[in-house]
A protein has these predicted regions:
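An alpha-helical appendage that flanks or caps ligand/catalytic pockets
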Residues: 7-9, 37, 126-161, 204-299, ...
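Glycine-rich, proline-tolerant flexible connector loops at the mouths of alpha/beta enzymes
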Residues: 42-66, 81, 113, 199-203, ...
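Internal, glycine-rich beta/alpha segment that forms the wall or movable "lid"
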Residues: 1-3, 89-192, 206-213, 221
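Conserved, mostly hydrophobic/aromatic
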Residues: 35, 39, 47, 66, ...
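Alpha-helix-loop-beta-strand connector modules within alpha/beta enzyme cores
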Residues: 53-77, 131-135, 319-331
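Hydrophobic faces of well-ordered beta-strands that scaffold small-molecule active sites
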Residues: 5-7, 43-45, 75-77, 105-109, ...
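N-terminal beta1-alpha1-beta2 module of alpha/beta enzyme domains
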Residues: 1-75, 172
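Active-site mouth loops of central-metabolism enzymes
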Residues: 11-26, 80-88, 168-179, 240, ...
C-alpha cells in the first residue's frame, strides 16, 4: 500500500508579530490550494479556543472556504472537539460540509486536552471521556441517517434526524485523536482510526512504531485485519536543500511555536532533532526518515509545515520539496 502524505494546519497565532489573523487565514487557504496541486491527500485543520494556541475555533468554517477553492484534495477536521458541542449540531454541520465537498470530508474527532478550553466551555475534564463517547456514538448514528430518540447522561432528544445527509449517504471516515499508546489500543479495539501527533505522545522516533503496534493490537482483539487499517501520524516538517539550511530557515519559528504549546514538556529545535520526532532537514534526510516510517508500517503521514509565523514562501518551498523530491524517493 502506498504511503499517503497530507498537511495539518494548526493555525497558531502570535499577536506580537506583524502577521494578522486575516493574513494567516489567507496563507492557510493558499497553502491548501498548493497542497492540492502537489498531490497531497488531505488538508487537516485544527480546532482551538480562547488562546493564540490556535485561531480557528470552528474548522467547518475554514473547510467550507477551502471547498470553494479546491476540487480533489480531501478536507479534514483535526480535530472536532466533541466534548464541547451539541452532537446534533456537529452532525448537521459536517454532513452539510461533506455534501458541499462532494464527499471529500474527513472527520477527525477528539475529547480535548487544554485546561483553558474546558474552563471556557464550563466543561469538567473528569467527564470528558464519557461525554466524548456518548457524543461520538450519537454523531455517527445521525450521520448514518438514523432517526434517534435518547436520554443520555449529557443530552437528550425525543426525536432527531438529519435533513441533510453526507454525500451519497456515506458516513465520512472518522479518526480519533490520541495522546498515549494505551488510548491507541482502545481506539483500535473500538474499530476506530487514530490521529496522533508523536511530538506530544512519543518519547522518540522509534516509539512511533510502538504506538502503531498498540493500535494494531487493539484492532486484532476486535477481529479486524491489520492490513486494512488506516491512521494518521502528524510530524513537524521543514524541507530545504541541506540540514543546515533547514535549521537556518525554521529554527526560530519552530521555537516560537513551541513557546505557545501548552504541553507539560516543550521540545525546542535541538530537542526534537535529538529525539528524531520531526521531519526537518534536507531532501535526503527527510526521505530517509519517511522510509523508516514506511518500514514501521505507517500508512499516512500528515506534515505540519506552517508554524511559528514561518514566512509563507518558506512554507510553500518546503511543501513543494516534500511532494516533488522527497516522496518520489519513498517508493
Amino acid at each position: 500500500m502506498d504511503l499517503r502524505y497530507s498537511v495539518f494546519s494548526v493555525n497558531d497565532h502570535h499577536p506580537g508579530l506583524a502577521r494578522t489573523v486575516p493574513q494567516l487565514y489567507q496563507q492557510v487557504m493558499r497553502q491548501c490550494e498548493l497542497a492540492e496541486s502537489l498531490g497531497y491527500d488531505t488538508f487537516f485543520c485544527a480546532e482551538h479556543h480562547f488562546h493564540e494556541y490556535g485561531v480557528v475555533p470552528d474548522p467547518a468554517v475554514m473547510l467550507s472556504a477551502l471547498v470553494q477553492r479546491t476540487k480533489r484534495i480531501r478536507l479534514g477536521s483535526a480535530i472536532s472537539i466533541l466534548t464541547f458541542h451539541d452532537p446534533r449540531r456537529i452532525a448537521e454541520t459536517y454532513a452539510m460540509l461533506d455534501m458541499m465537498s462532494g464527499g471529500r470530508f474527513v472527520f477527525g474527532v477528539g475529547s480535548g486536552y487544554l485546561a483553558h478550553e474546558f474552563t471556557g466551555y464550563d466543561s469538567q475534564p473528569a467527564e470528558k471521556r464519557d461525554r466524548f463517547n456518548e457524543n461520538l456514538g450519537l454523531v455517527r448514528r445521525l450521520l448514518a441517517g438514523e432517526t434517534l430518540g435518547w436520554q443520555g447522561k449529557f443530552s437528550k432528544s425525543e426525536k432527531a434526524v438529519l435533513n441533510v445527509l453526507p454525500h451519497e449517504g456515506r458516513v465520512p471516515p472518522i479518526y480519533v485523536a490520541v495522546l498515549a499508546r494505551e488510548a491507541a489500543f482502545h481506539v483500535g479495539k473500538q474499530e476506530n482510526r487514530i490521529f496522533t501527533v508523536p511530538y506530544a505522545s512519543c518519547k522518540d522516533f522509534d516509539d512511533i512504531g510502538t504506538m502503531l503496534a498498540e493500535y494494531r493490537k487493539g484492532r486484532a482483539e476486535a477481529g479486524l485485519p491489520a492490513d486494512d487499517d488506516d491512521h494518521v501520524f502528524t510530524l513537524h516538517t521543514h524541507v530545504a536543500r541541506s540540514d543546515a539550511e533547514a535549521q537556518e530557515q525554521c529554527k526560530e519559528a519552530y521555537d516560537l511555536y513551541v513557546d505557545t504549546r501548552l504541553y507539560a514538556k516543550k521540545h525546542l529545535y535541538e530537542d526534537i532533532i535529538a529525539n528524531g520526532i520531526c521531519l526537518f532537514g534536507s531532501v535526503a534526510t527527510v526521505a530517509a526518515k519517511m522510509r523508516r516510517l514506511r518500514d514501521m508500517g505507517v500508512r499516512h503521514v500528515a506534515t505540519l509545515q506552517n508554524f511559528g509565523a514561518l514566512a509563507p514562501q518558506l512554507v510553500e518551498s518546503s511543501m513543494t520539496l516534500f511532494a516533488e523530491e522527497v516522496m518520489p524517493k519513498i517508493s
